[in-house]
């Protein structure tokens, strides 16, 4: 006999609602568009290849990140597009508890959420490198944490974009987009 429960269709949404909770405020997350997904899958593959056989591992949304867990806040939870885990002690079956060294967000509909709200959260948590990809303007912003603030570098999609945290890692966004 199956453990699956019978679900009444009219009572159940087709897709599970995804949310992020930052400092007690809940944010609904919409489904990513085709361009976002195209970039996402290409970058996930690049990071998976780069970290193969190395001590760090990339994780992709939807997977929970509790960036302020070190400070005792396990209520704040986000689902970055991609983040890299190096401290396996913080990795649990249900998420990662603490700031990862690298977070990547691909901008979609709610640009200010990634550019303001999550930037401030990642800064407070001590995320070392925050990469924001803007498919609309074809710009990549690499923010590297040091001396209490983020240092900002901007690149175009045609540039060879270096990670400032992981030597030898480059983000290649020179591939054609579907739209």
Name each model-derived stretch:
Residues 1-179:
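Gly/Pro/Ser/Thr-rich low-complexity, intrinsically disordered segments predominantly at protein N-termini
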